Amino acid sequence: MIERGKFRSLTLINWNGFFARTFDLDELVTTLSGGNGAGKSTTMAAFVTALIPDLTLLHFRNTTEAGATSGSRDKGLHGKLKAGVCYSMLDTINSRHQRVVVGVRLQQVAGRDRKVDIKPFAIQGLPMSVQPTQLVTETLNERQARVLSLAELKDKLDEMEGVQFKQFNSITDYHSLMFDLGIIARRLRSASDRSKFYRLIEASLYGGISSAITRSLRDYLLPENSGVRKAFQDMEAALRENRLTLEAIRVTQSDRDLFKHLISEATDYVAADYMRHANERRVHLDQALAFRRELYTSRKQLAAEQYKHVDMARELGEHNGAEGSLEADYQAASDHLNLVQTALRQQEKIERYEADLEELQIRLEEQNEVVAEAAEMQDENEARAEAAELEVDELKSQLADYQQALDVQQTRAIQYNQAISALARAKELCHLPDLTPESAAEWLDTFQAKEQEATEKLLSLEQKMSVAQTAHSQFEQAYQLVAAINGPLARSEAWDVARELLRDGVNQRHLAEQVQPLRMRLSELEQRLREQQEAERLLAEFCKRQGKNFDIDELEALHQELEARIASLSESVSSASEQRMALRQEQEQLQSRIQHLMQRAPVWLAAQNSLNQLSEQCGEEFTSSQEVTEYLQQLLEREREAIVERDEVGARKNAVDEEIERLSQPGGAEDQRLNALAERFGGVLLSEIYDDVSLEDAPYFSALYGPSRHAIVVPDLSQIAEQLEGLTDCPEDLYLIEGDPQSFDDSVFSVDELEKAVVVKIADRQWRYSRFPSLPIFGRAARENRIESLHAEREVLSERFATLSFDVQKTQRLHQAFSRFIGSHLSVAFEDDPEAEIRRLNGRRVELERALATHESDNQQQRLQFEQAKEGVSALNRLLPRLNLLADETLADRVDEIQERLDEAQEAARFVQQYGNQLAKLEPVVSVLQSDPEQFEQLKEDYAWSQQMQRDARQQAFALAEVVERRAHFSYSDSAEMLSGNSDLNEKLRQRLEQAEAERTRAREALRSHAAQLSQYSQVLASLKSSYDTKKELLNDLQRELQDIGVRADSGAEERARQRRDELHAQLSNNRSRRNQLEKALTFCEAEMENLTRKLRKLERDYHEMREQVVTAKAGWCAVMRMVKDNGVERRLHRRELAYLSADELRSMSDKALGALRLAVADNEHLRDVLRLSEDPKRPERKIQFFVAVYQHLRERIRQDIIRTDDPVEAIEQMEIELSRLTEELTSREQKLAISSRSVANIIRKTIQREQNRIRMLNQGLQSVSFGQVNSVRLNVNVRETHATLLDVLSEQQEQHQDLFNSNRLTFSEALAKLYQRLNPQIDMGQRTPQTIGEELLDYRNYLEMEVEVNRGSDGWLRAESGALSTGEAIGTGMSILVMVVQSWEDEARRLRGKDISPCRLLFLDEAARLDARSIATLFELCERLQMQLIIAAPENISPEKGTTYKLVRKVFQNTEHVHVVGLRGFAPQLPETLPGTQTEDTPSEAS
C-alpha cells in the first residue's frame, strides 16, 4: 500500500518572537496551546505563507486593524516579521520517501505601505540528519547566530553533494513542483485555483461552514469534464470550419464570374497603366536623349552666334567709334562752315560799324567843344548867382536880426553876437587869428585884391587850355590806335611800337594773300589721306575676317585663290542636297517598315503568350506546329488513364469513410440502433462498459467476446423478454447479457487463453476459438487507434483523389487551351520575332539620323566657308583699286606741312582783317607820337586849382566885408543913439537888400536860360556819346567774337568749308549705313541668340525636368519593379502587346477598367479604399498595391484548403475543377461530424450518473462523523428541473426542434442555448450570448445542484447552515466538508499525477476551544481514518490525549521579546516527555 506523504516540521526564522524555531508536526494532530498573543496565529500564518506565498490572497484578519477593508496596506503579515531576512520552511516526506524542503524567504520592504517581499524556493536531496535551522543560520558564538541571505543559502547548498536548490520566479512553478512531489493535492494552474485552495485553508483555519465554499461546491467537488467540452469545441470548430469552407465555396461559386471580371479588369487597369508608364519611361528617356542632343546642338549654335556676335559687335564698335569721330568731324566741319558764314557776317557788321563810328567821332568832337563853352559860361553864371544868393541871405539875416533887436530888449546883445560870429567866421576863412574889427577893413582890401588877381590868372589859363587841347586830341587818337593793335603799353614806347606794327602789317598782308592757294592744296591732300585711311581700314577688316595678316603684294593672289574656293564649294553644296535626299528616302523606308512590324508585333506577342502559357502548363517546349498537334494527341491518352485511376481511388475512399463512420458511433456501437435499444431496455452496451480497456488488452477482450462484443448488458433478462416480441428495428444478431453495469466482470465465460488466441467454452458442447484480431476495435483506445489509421489512409486517399481529379480537369482544360491555340495563333506563333527586326531597324534608323546630323553639320560648315569666301572676294574688290594709296607713306607728312603753312596764312589773314583799318588810320598820324603833350594835364590841374583859389578868395572877401559891416555892433552908444543909428542902418539894409534881390533875380534868370541851353547841349553830347559808346562796344564785341571764332573770313572760305562738310557727310552717311546694317544684323543675331538662349533655357529646363522626371520615375519605377517582382505579378502586368498602343489608348483602357472596378469593389471597403488611393497618377506603385490587394483578396476568398495555388488566375482555373468535388466531400464530412442531440443528452446523463456515484462514495466516508447533536453529514446532488427537461427533449423530442440543429447559421452550442430559451422563456438570460449559454449547457456541472445536509437530533436531515448549528457543530461540519473536498481533489488529480504518490493532507483549526471533548475526539478519529494531519490552535485548557501539543508562552527578556515553547506528545497513557528536536526555551540571538 502506498504511504501518504506527511509534513515533518515547520521552521520559522526571524519571525516576531521566533528567531530560529522548528516545530515537529505530528502525523495526526498538532496542537498549539497558549494564551492570547502567545504566537499561535503567527505560527499558522508562517505555515500558510509557505504553502501559498501569494500576497494578493494572504490576509490574516485577526491581527489587522479594526474595521480593515480589502484595501488595507497591511494584510497582517508585515507585523509578524522582524527586520532583516526571514524564512518560513516546510520539511516534508512524500510517498516515495523523498525529503523535500519548501519554503519562502520574506523581508520587510521599507516604506509606509508595509509591504513584504516573498521569494519561494525548494530543496531536494537533503540528508535526514540536516536540520532546517542549520541551513539558514550561521553560528557566530555560543549565544549569537546570523541569518543567511537567499544567495548565501544557495551557495551553501551548492557545496553539498546531491542537494538541489530551486528558486522560483512564479507561484505557479512553485505549486507545480509541490503538486508533482505530492505536497499539495491539486495542481494549481491559475490564480483562480490558488484562490480556491486559499479559501479552503482559510475556511479550515477560522472554522465553521464557509459560505464561499458551500456556494460553489460544484467547483470544488465536481471535476471539470474538459475532455468532453474539448470534444464539443473541436467538433464545433470543425463544423464551423466546414461550414465556413462550404460557405466560401458557395460564395466562390457565386463570385466566380466576379473573380474573373475583377481579375480581368484589374489586370487591364493596372497592366495598361503599368505598360503606359513603361512606354512613357522609354519615351521620356528618348525625349531626354533628344533634349540632350538638341541641347548640345543649340549650345554649339549659340557659341557660333556668340562668336559672330562678338565679331559684329567689335566691327559695330569700330563703326560706332568711327561714326563718333566722323560725327565730330562733320559737326566740326558744319560748325566751321557756320563760323565762316558767321565771320563773314561779322566782318560786314564790323565794317559798317567802323564807318558809323568815324562819323560819330567827328560829330562828338564838335559837340564837345560846344558843351565846353556852354559849361564855362554856366560856371560863371552859377558863381554870380551864388554870390547874389549869399548876399541876399546875409542881408535878410541882418535885417531880421536887427528887426528882432528892435522889438526885444536884447536886440543889442543879438547884434553883438552876430558880429562876433561874423568875426570868428572871417578868422577861420582868412586864416587870421589876430583879426579885429578895427583891422577888418584893412584886410578886406587885401583880400579883395587877391580875388582880383585870382580872377585874372584864371582867365589866362583858359586861353592856354583852348590852345593845348587840339594837340592833345591828335596824340591820344594815335596812341589809342597803337594800344588797340598792340595792347597796353607805355606812352614813351608808342612811337617805336607804331613803326613796328606798320612794318609787320605789310608782311601779314603778303601772307594773307596765300591762304586760298594753300587751302585748295590742303583740301586735295586731305581727300587722298582719307581715301588712304579708308583703304587701310578695309584691309584691317579683311585681315580680321580672314584671321590672318596679309601684305599688299599678296592680295591679288589671295583674290584668285578665293575665287577658286568659291567654285569648288559651290559644287560641294549642290552635291550635298542629293546625298541628303538619298538618306532621307532610306529613313522613310525604314520608318514604314518599322510601322508595319509594330502593327504585326501585338498579334505575334499574343500568340507567343498563348504558346508560353501552354509550355508552362505542360512543361514542354514547342518549336513547330507539328509538335503542338502531336502533344494534343498525348493529352487525350493521358486524360483517359487519369479518369480510370481517379474512379478507383474514389471507391476506396468511400469504403474508408464508411468504416470510420461505423467506428465513430458513441459507445463503440457499430450499429446506431444498438444505442436506442440499450436505452430502451435500460441497459448498457458491452462495448461501453469496456470502453476504457487499454490498447494492449483490446485484442484479448475482442477475441473473448467475439460476435457478442456488441451485446447489451441488462440488469434482468426476464424484464425485457416481453419487449423482444415484435422487435424488428435491430441487427440480425442481437446479444443480451445479464449483469450489473456498475460492477460487470468477464466471469460469464469459461476461457482458455492460447498464443494470440482464446478458446471460449460457451456450453458443454459448444466452444468458440477466436484469434486476437490484428486490428482490434474493442474499446475506445482500439477504436481511436483504428480511426486514426483510417483517417491517415483517408487523408492520403483524399489527397490522391483530389490530385487525380485536378489532373483530369487540368488535362481537359489544357486540351481546350491547345484547341484554342491551334484555332487562333498557330499560323503566326512560329514566325520570326518582329521585335528583334524592329530593334535592328531602329539601330539602322539611329545610324541614319546620326549620318544626317553629320551631313547637315558638314553642309552648314561648307555654306559658312562659301559665305566667308564670297565676303572676302567682295572686300578684295574694294581694296585692289586703292593699292597705290596704301603704298604712299609720305602723304600724311605733306598734309601736316601744308596745314602748318595754311595756319600761318590764316593767322595773318585774321590779323589783317582785324587790324587793317587801325593800321591805315595810324599811318598818317604816326608822326604825332614822336612828342607826348603831357603839359596838357598839368595845365588842366592848374586851371582847376586857379578856379578853387578864386572861389576861396571870394568867400574870404565876403566874410571880411561882413565883419566890416558889423563893426558898429561891437560897441554901442546909448539907447537913443542906438535907435537912431539902428534906424539908419535898417534903412540902408533895406536898400541893399532890394538891390541884392534884384541882382539875384537877374542872375537866376541868366543861370536858368543858360542851364537850359547847357542841358540841351549836354543831351546832344550824351546822345552822341551813348551812340558812340554803344557802337564802339558793339564793334569791340564783334571784333572779340570774330577773334573768338578764330576764322579768317575770305571769299573762298565758305566754299571750302561747305565742300569739307559735304565730304564728311557722305562718309558719315556711308558709315551710318554700314552701322545700320551691322545693327540690324546684330539685332537679328541678338534675337537669334536670345531665341537660342530661351530655347537653350527651355531645353535645359525641359532636359532637367525630363531628367528629373526620368530619375524620379526611375526611383518610382524601381519601387514598382521591386514590388512587382516581390509579389510575382510581373508576368501578369508586363503585357508586351500593350507596348504598341498609344498613351491615350492605354489611358482609355485603364479608365474603362477603372469604371468597371469601381462597380465591382463597391461593396468591399478595403478594395474600394485601395482603388481610390491607386487613382493618384503620381503614385503608380499604388496601382500595383491595388493589384496585389486584389490578388490577396482573391487568395483569401479562394482559401488554400480548397485550391492549392497562390495565383488567383490559376486558382480560377482550378476553381471549377475543385468546387464540385469539395462541395460533395464537405457536405458528407459535415454529416459525419455533426453529433445528434440524443448523443449529447446520453453523454451528459452518463457523466452525471458517474459523478453522482462518486459523491455517493464520498458520503459513505462521512456517515460515521458526528459533532454534538449532528449524527451524520452528507452531500445531496440533484439534477435541476429545467435542465432535466432539456435532457428529455434532447433525447425524445429532438425532431420537433430540428430547425435549430439543422441550421447552418447556428453552431450546436447556439442551437442548444436557443432550445433552452425556448423551453424556459421565464428565465432571464441577461447580456450573455447564445454561444456562452450553450457552452455552459454542455458542462454537466451546470445541470447539478449540491447542498450539504446534516442529521441533527430529532430534526432529521436538514440543510447545513451556520444559523441552525452550534459553533462546535458548524466547525465539525465545515471540517467534514473540507475533508471531502480534499479527497475529491485527490481523486481528480490521480489521473494527472503518478500512481505511486499519495499527497499530503493537512488542515488547520484556530480557536479549537469552541469544540467539546467529544467533537475533538471525533476530529482525531477522522484524521486517523483519513490519514490527515491537523494543526489546532487552542487556549491552555485544551489537553488532547493524542497527537503532539506545544505550549507557547511569550516573554520579554532584556527588552527582547521571545516565545517560550514546550512540546508534549500523547500524555494520557504515559508521562509527558519532551519531544526530540525541541528546546525548552527559544533563546533569542542577535544578528551580527
From Swiss-Prot:
Q: Which segments does the entry list as coiled coil?
A: 326-418, 444-472, 509-602, 835-923, 977-1116, 1209-1265
Superkingdom assignment: Bacteria
Instruction: Tell whether Coiled coil is among the UniProt keywords.
Output: yes
Instruction: Write out the GO MF terms.
Output: ATP binding; DNA binding
Q: Would I find Acyltransferase among this entry's keywords?
A: no
Segments of this protein annotated with the region Flexible hinge: 666-783
Q: Which keywords annotate this record?
A: ATP-binding, Cell cycle, Cell division, Chromosome partition, Coiled coil, Cytoplasm, DNA condensation, DNA-binding, Nucleotide-binding
The residues listed in the UniProt record as binding ATP, with positions renumbered to this chain, are: 34-41
Location of region: Disordered:
1049-1074
Q: What InterPro entries does UniProt report for this protein, alphabetically? A: MukB, MukB/SMC, MukB_hinge, MukB_hinge_sf, MukB_N_dom, P-loop_NTPase
- Any idea where this protein resides? Cytoplasm, Nucleoid
Q: Which PANTHER family match?
A: CHROMOSOME PARTITION PROTEIN MUKB (PTHR42963), DUF4476 DOMAIN-CONTAINING PROTEIN (PTHR42963:SF1)
Q: What does the entry note on its domains?
A: The hinge domain, which separates the large intramolecular coiled coil regions, allows the homodimerization, forming a V-shaped homodimer.
Name of protein: Chromosome partition protein MukB
At the highest ranks, the source species' classification is:
Bacteria, Pseudomonadati, Pseudomonadota, Gammaproteobacteria, Enterobacterales
